[in-house]
C-alpha cells in the first residue's frame, strides 16, 4: 500500500492515540492509528534500576553529554567544559511517569515519535501491511511504525478536498448577537477529491415575504424544506434557518482535508455552532477514524499575555477541537503572522494580493472599459486577477476609486471589464480588489429579495476569496514544507512560535551527532547591543545609491564563528585596564586563530570594562549545523524561484525561501531568548558583535572607493577584521568594466546587514552594470569564508528622513532604465494607520515633487527648500480658507484598550463619554475613528495646547455642524514636521515652522 502522509492528529480520550491521515495513489483516504507515548531519555544505569520496568525501551547508543553553562573568568585559567559519555535509552510510556534524572525532556512527544521511527511527517511510504490491523473500512491500527514505514518512496501527487465558507448575519447595531440575529446567508466553495468545484449559497427564507420567496423561485432559485432535498449543484437555495444550519452541520462533519475560513474560528464557525444549538439543541459532532471517540465542535481560546500586541492587548488565538483529521484553517490568523500590512481586513488583504495594471480600452458616460493580460503587467498577474474577477462585484481603480462591475469577459490569461466609473484621463491604471462599496447595516435595514440576492453575490465572493488567498499564499506547500522542516504534524505547523518549532530539527540533529546538551545553572539574561545602524550622511540624493545586502548575515556569522553553547570555551572579563591589557596579550597565544575566534563584546555588568568570548572552531557546533540545513533549503527554493515562469509559482517559491530565511534568522533570536532550548547569551551577543564588525568592514572598503581605467581602488586594504589570513589585501583590483568608466563611491547609510553606497552617476543602466561587477569583486576579493553579499537594487532620488525611514524609486538588480521603478516607503507615514489620508496624500505629493527636483538637478538644496516651503504654505493656507476637503480625509483610528498607566487617561475618558450617550458602544479591542474638531469661528491657531480635548469620535451618524470646523492646524503641524525633516536647510525650516506654528520643529535623530 503506497501512501502519502497529509495530516497527523491526536485523540485525547481515556485511551490516547495518534492518527495519520494518508492518501493512496488512487485517491483513497486511509487512516492509521498508533499508540500514544510519552518519551524519556535516561542513562543505562537509570534504565536498569527502573521499577516497574519501562513499557518500551530503545537503545540510543553512546551519547556525549555536554554541560553548556557559560564559564565566566577574570583570567585565562578557564576550566574545561564538563563532558561525559554514557549508553542512553529512549523510554516509551503510555502514561506520564516521574523518572529522576531524565534528560532531553524539553522536546515534544510527537517529534520523538517521528524521529525514533524514521518517519517524515509529509513523506510517501510503501507500507508493509503485515504490521497493520484493520479496524474498519479505511482505518488500521499499527503497533510497529518503524517497520511498517521502513520503505520510503519518491513523492507522488495526490488530490485534496476543501471547504471554503463565509456567512452573513443580520444585525441592527454594529455587531450581530447569536441570541437575536439570524444568519441570512451561508456560502460555500466545495472542492472534492475529483477536483470538482461547487459554488452554492443558502439564503434564509424567513427574512423574506412569501411573495418574495415565490418571485425568487420564479427567477431560478431552489426552495427546499429539509436537508434531504438539498441539491449542491444549484447556486442559490432558499430554506429556513434551521435547514441552513443543518446543512452547515452536515458539511462540517465531513472529513475534508481542509476547512478554510477568514476569521472563522472567532466568528463564522462559532456563530454557526452556537446558533444551531440555540435553535435545535443539536451540536456539530466529530468522530475519530476508529469511531471510538466523539467530540463536539468547540472553539477554545489561547491567550498569550506574554506576547502583547498593539495597545497592550493580549495575543489571543482561536482553535477548533476536532478529531477527524480535517485541518480547520483560519486565513486571518495565518496572514497576521506572515504579513506586515496596514490592515488585516479581508478587503485590505485581497487588495494587497490581487492587483494588476489594466489598460483603458474605452471611455463611456460614467463607465470605463479596462483590459488586462500578459502585455499590461507581469506574466500571471492578469490571470490571477481574472480568476478573482469571476466572482468579484467591485474593483478598486488607482488605489481608492471603488467601482461596481457592470460586465466582465474572462479568458485564460486575461480579462475585459466594464466598470461604473468616473472618466479618468490616463491610459493605464492599477486595478485591485478592495472594499465593496456597500453598507451592510443599511442593506439589512432595507432588506428585500433584490438585496438578498446581491448579498448572496458578496457572500460567495468572500468564500471564493478564501480559496484565492489560500492559493496565493501557497498555504498547502508551506504546510507540507513546515511539517518536514519542523518535524511537526501539518495541523500544528502554524500553531507554535519559533522557540517551539525549532525543537524538532534540533532534536533530529542532536540524535544524529549523539549529543545531549544540559545545564545545571539557572539561565541568566543580560541586555546586549543589536545591529549597527549608520546615521544618514544627508537627506536628499540626486545621484544613484547602490544597495548591497549580506546574504543571511546572522546565520552566516554563527557558521563562521562556530557560535554554539557547547563550542564556547569561556568568557574572559576585566574590571580594570591593566587586567584587560594582560588578558588581550595572552589570549591570542593560548587561543590562536583560526582554530579559535575571540569576540570583543560590550560588558554585561557596569563594573566590567571589557568582555571577550572565545569559541572553538575545530568541530562544527549544533547551531551552525542547524543553520546549514536551513540555508541549504533556502538556496534550493531560491533556485526554483529563478526557474519559475508564472507569478503564482514565483509567489510560492519566494514565500518558501523567505520562510527558511526567517527560520534561519530566528535562530539568532532564540540564542538570546531565555526559554529557548538554544539559549546562549554569549553566542547571541557575539553574533551581533561580529555582524557589526562585518558591516563596518564593508563600509570601510567602499566609502571612498574609485573606479578608473578598468581598475577599482577600494578605500582600505582588504584585511580580515578578525585575524590575519593568507588572502591578498591589495585594495587595487582589476575589473571587467570599460576603461573609460570613472566613478567615485561614498557610503551614505547602512542598517544591520545592508550598505547604501552612492555612485556619482544618475544613469540607471550604468549603475546596475557597475553594481553587479562590484558584487562579484566584493564576494571574490573583499569577503572571506562563507560571507557573501548581494546587489539588491539601485535607489533613485533617495530621500532619507532619518534612520530606518526613507522614500525612493527602486530599480531591482534584474531591471533596467526602461523598467517601471517601484516606489518604496520604508518606515514613513504612508505605511502607518495612525496618519490621516490628508497627511498621506500631501506627503506623497511633496515626496514626488522632491524626486522630480532631484532628477532635474537644476536646483541646489537651498533652492529646493525654499520652493518646497513656499508651495507648502500656499497649499495649507488655501485648504484652511476653502475648507473643501471632506472630513474622511482627516479621520484617524485608534484601538480602544484599558492598558493605560493612568486611570483617567484622556483616550479612555473619550470612549467612556461616547459610550454613555450612544447605543452602539465601542468595545475593548475595537478600533474607532476620531478627528480633531473645533468651533468654526476659531482663527488660525499657532500655539496648539490641550489638543486631546478637541478629539471627537466619528461614527456613521456624525455630521460636521455649521458651527464646527476641522482643527486643521493639528494636521498641518504634523505634516509640516515630516516635510521639514526631508529638507537639508535647518535654518530655513525652523524659521518657516516658527512663523506658521509659533514653535521650533522636532528634527528626527540622525
UniProtKB/Swiss-Prot annotation:
Induction: Expressed in the early phase of the viral replicative cycle. GO terms for molecular function: 3'-5' exonuclease activity; DNA binding; DNA-directed DNA polymerase activity; nucleotide binding. Keywords: DNA recombination, DNA replication, DNA-binding, DNA-directed DNA polymerase, Early protein, Hydrolase, Multifunctional enzyme, Nucleotidyltransferase, Transferase, Viral DNA replication. The keyword Hydrolase applies. Changing residue 392 to D: In NG26 mutant; temperature-sensitivity. It holds the Pfam family DNA_pol_B. It comes from the Viruses. Gene3D superfamilies: Helix hairpin bin, Palm domain of DNA polymerase, Ribonuclease H-like superfamily/Ribonuclease H. One of its GO terms (biological process) is viral DNA genome replication. It catalyses: DNA(n) + a 2'-deoxyribonucleoside 5'-triphosphate = DNA(n+1) + diphosphate. PANTHER family: DNA POLYMERASE CATALYTIC SUBUNIT, DNA POLYMERASE DELTA CATALYTIC SUBUNIT. Ts42 is a temperature-sensitive mutant. PAArVg is a mutant resistant to the drug phosphonoacetic acid (PAA). NG26 is a double mutant with a temperature-sensitive lesion and a mutation rendering the virus resistant to PAA. Catalyzes DNA synthesis. Acquires processivity by associating with a heterodimeric processivity factor comprised of the viral OPG148/A20 and OPG116/D4 proteins, thereby forming the DNA polymerase holoenzyme. Displays 3'- to 5' exonuclease activity. Might participate in viral DNA recombination. Does not perform OPG116/D4synthesis across an abasic site. Interacts with OPG148/A20. Component of the Uracil-DNA glycosylase(UDG)-OPG148/A20-polymerase complex; OPG148/A20 and OPG116/UDG form a heterodimeric processivity factor that associates with OPG071/E9 to form the processive polymerase holoenzyme. Belongs to the DNA polymerase type-B family. This is DNA polymerase. It comes from Vaccinia virus (strain Western Reserve). The gene is OPG071.
Amino acid at each position: 500500500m503506497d501512501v502519502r502522509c497529509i495530516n497527523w492528529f491526536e485523540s485525547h480520550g481515556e485511551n490516547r492515540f495518534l492518527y495519520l491521515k494518508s492518501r493512496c495513489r488512487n485517491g483513497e483516504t486511509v487512516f492509521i492509528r498508533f499508540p500514544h507515548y510519552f518519551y524519556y531519555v535516561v542513562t543505562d544505569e537509570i534504565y536498569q534500576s527502573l521499577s516497574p520496568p519501562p513499557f518500551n525501551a530503545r537503545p540510543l547508543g553512546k551519547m556525549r553529554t555536554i554541560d553548556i553553562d557559560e564559564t565566566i573568568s577574570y583570567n585565562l585559567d578557564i576550566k574545561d567544559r564538563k563532558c561525559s559519555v554514557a549508553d542512553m535509552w529512549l523510554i516509551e510510556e503510555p502514561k506520564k511517569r516521574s523518572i529522576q534524572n531524565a534528560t532531553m525532556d524539553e522536546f515534544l512527544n510527537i517529534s520523538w515519535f517521528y524521529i525514533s521511527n524514521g518517519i517524515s511527517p509529509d513523506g510517501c511510504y510503501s507500507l508493509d501491511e503485515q504490521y497493520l490491523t484493520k479496524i474498519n473500512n479505511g482505518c488500521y491500527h499499527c503497533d510497529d511504525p518503524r517497520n511498517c514505514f521502513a520503505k520510503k518512496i519518491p513523492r507522488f501527487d495526490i488530490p485534496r478536498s476543501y471547504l471554503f465558507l463565509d456567512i452573513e448575519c443580520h444585525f441592527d447595531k454594529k455587531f450581530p448577537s447569536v441570541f437575536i440575529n439570524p444568519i441570512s446567508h451561508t456560502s460555500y466553495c466545495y472542492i472534492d477529491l475529483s477536483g470538482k468545484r461547487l459554488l452554492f449559497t443558502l439564503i434564509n427564507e424567513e427574512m423574506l415575504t412569501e411573495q418574495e420567496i415565490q418571485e425568487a423561485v420564479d427567477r431560478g432559485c431552489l426552495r427546499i424544506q429539509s436537508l434531504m432535498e438539498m441539491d449542491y449543484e444549484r447556486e442559490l437555495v432558499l430554506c429556513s434557518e434551521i435547514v441552513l444550519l443543518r446543512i452547515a452541520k452536515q458539511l462540517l462533519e465531513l472529513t475534508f482535508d481542509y476547512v478554510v475560513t477568514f476569521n472563522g474560528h472567532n466568528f463564522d464557525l462559532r456563530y454557526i455552532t452556537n446558533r444551531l444549538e440555540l435553535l435545535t439543541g443539536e451540536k456539530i459532532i466529530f468522530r475519530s477514524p476508529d469511531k471510538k471517540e466523539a467530540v463536539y465542535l468547540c472553539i477554545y481560546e489561547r491567550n498569550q499575555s506574554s506576547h502583547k500586541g498593539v495597545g497592550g492587548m493580549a495575543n489571543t488565538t482561536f482553535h477548533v477541537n476536532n478529531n477527524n483529521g480535517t485541518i480547520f484553517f483560519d486565513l486571518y490568523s495565518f496572514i497576521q503572522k506572515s504579513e506586515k500590512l496596514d490592515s488585516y481586513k479581508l478587503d485590505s488583504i485581497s487588495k494587497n494580493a490581487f492587483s494588476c495594471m489594466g489598460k483603458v480600452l474605452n471611455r463611456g458616460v460614467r463607465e470605463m472599459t479596462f483590459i488586462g493580460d500578459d502585455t499590461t503587467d507581469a506574466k500571471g498577474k492578469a490571470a490571477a486577477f481574472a480568476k478573482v474577477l469571476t466572482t468579484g462585484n467591485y474593483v478598486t481603480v488607482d488605489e481608492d476609486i471603488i467601482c461596481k462591475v457592470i460586465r466582465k469577459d474572462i479568458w485564460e490569461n486575461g480579462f475585459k471589464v466594464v466598470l461604473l466609473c468616473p472618466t479618468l484621463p490616463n491610459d493605464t491604471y492599477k486595478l485591485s480588489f478592495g472594499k465593496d462599496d456597500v453598507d451592510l447595516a443599511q442593506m439589512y435595514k432595507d432588506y428585500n429579495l433584490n438585496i438578498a440576492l446581491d448579498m448572496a453575490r458578496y457572500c460567495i465572493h468572500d468564500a471564493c476569496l478564501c480559496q484565492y488567498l489560500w492559493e496565493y499564499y501557497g498555504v498547502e506547500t508551506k504546510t507540507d514544507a513546515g511539517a518536514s522542516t519542523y518535524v511537526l504534524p501539518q495541523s500544528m505547523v502554524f500553531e507554535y512560535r519559533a522557540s517551539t518549532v525549532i525543537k524538532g530539527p534540533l532534536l533530529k540533529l542532536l540524535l544524529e551527532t549523539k549529543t545531549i546538551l544540559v545545564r545545571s545553572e539557572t539561565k541568566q539574561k543580560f541586555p546586549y547591543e543589536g545591529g549597527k545602524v549608520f546615521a544618514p550622511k544627508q537627506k536628499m540624493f540626486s545621484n544613484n545609491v547602490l544597495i548591497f545586502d549580506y546574504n543571511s548575515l546572522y546565520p552566516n556569522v554563527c557558521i563562521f564563528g562556530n557560535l554554539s553553547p557547547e563550542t564556547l570555551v569561556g568568557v574572559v572579563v576585566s574590571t580594570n585596564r591593566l587586567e584587560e591589557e594582560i588578558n588581550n596579550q595572552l589570549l591570542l597565544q593560548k587561543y590562536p586563530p583560526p582554530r579559535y575566534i575571540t569576540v570583543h563584546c560590550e560588558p554585561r555588568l557596569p563594573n566590567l570594562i571589557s568582555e571577550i568570548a572565545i569559541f572553538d572552531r575545530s568541530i562544527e557546533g549544533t547551531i551552525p549545523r542547524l543553520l546549514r540545513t536551513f540555508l541549504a533549503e533556502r538556496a534550493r527554493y531560491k533556485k526554483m524561484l529563478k526557474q519559475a515562469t508564472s507569478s503564482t509559482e514565483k509567489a510560492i517559491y519566494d514565500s518558501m525561501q523567505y520562510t527558511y530565511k526567517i527560520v534561519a534568522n530566528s535562530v539568532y533570536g532564540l540564542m538570546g531568548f531565555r526559554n529557548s532550548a538554544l539559549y546562549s547569551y554569549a553566542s547571541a551577543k557575539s553574533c551581533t558583535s561580529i555582524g557589526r564588525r562585518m558591516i563596518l568592514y564593508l563600509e570601510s572598503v567602499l566609502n571612498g572607493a574609485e573606479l578608473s581605467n578598468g581598475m577599482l581602488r577600494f578605500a582600505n586594504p582588504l584585511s580580515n577584521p578578525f585575524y590575519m589570513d593568507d588572502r591578498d589585501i591589495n585594495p587595487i583590483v582589476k575589473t571587467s568594466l570599460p576603461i573609460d568608466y570613472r566613478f567615485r563611491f561614498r557610503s551614505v547609510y547602512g542598517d544591520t546587514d545592508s550598505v547604501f553606497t552612492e555612485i556619482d552617476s544618475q544613469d540607471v543602466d550604468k549603475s546596475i552594470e557597475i553594481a553587479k561587477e562590484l558584487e562579484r569583486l566584493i564576494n571574490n576579493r573583499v569577503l572571506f569564508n562563507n560571507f557573501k553579499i548581494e546587489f539588491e537594487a539601485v535607489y533613485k532620488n533617495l530621500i532619507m528622513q532619518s534612520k530606518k525611514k526613507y522614500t525612493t524609486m527602486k530599480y531591482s538588480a534584474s531591471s533596467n532604465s526602461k523598467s517601471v521603478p517601484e516606489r518604496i516607503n520604508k518606515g514613513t507615514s504612508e505605511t502607518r494607520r495612525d496618519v490621516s489620508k490628508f497627511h498621506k496624500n500631501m506627503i506623497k505629493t511633496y515626496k514626488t515633487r522632491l524626486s522630480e527636483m532631484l532628477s532635474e538637478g537644476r536646483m541646489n538644496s537651498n533652492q529646493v527648500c525654499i520652493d518646497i516651503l513656499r508651495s507648502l504654505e500656499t497649499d495649507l493656507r488655501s485648504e484652511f480658507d476653502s475648507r473643501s476637503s471632506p472630513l474622511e480625509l482627516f479621520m484617524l483610528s485608534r484601538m480602544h484598550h484599558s492598558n493605560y498607566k493612568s486611570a483617567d487617561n484622556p483616550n479612555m475618558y473619550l470612549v467612556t463619554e461616547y459610550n454613555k450617550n450612544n447605543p452602539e458602544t465601542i468595545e475593548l479591542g475595537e478600533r474607532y475613528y476620531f478627528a480633531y474638531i473645533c468651533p468654526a469661528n476659531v482663527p488660525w491657531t499657532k500655539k496648539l495646547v490641550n489638543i486631546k480635548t478637541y478629539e471627537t469620535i466619528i461614527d456613521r451618524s456624525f455630521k460636521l455642524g455649521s458651527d464646527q470646523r476641522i482643527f486643521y492646524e493639528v494636521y498641518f503641524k504634523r505634516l509640516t514636521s515630516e516635510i521639514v525633516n526631508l529638507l537639508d536647510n535647518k535654518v530655513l525650516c525652523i524659521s518657516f515652522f516658527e512663523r506658521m506654528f509659533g514653535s521650533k520643529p522636532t528634527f528626527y535623530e540622525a
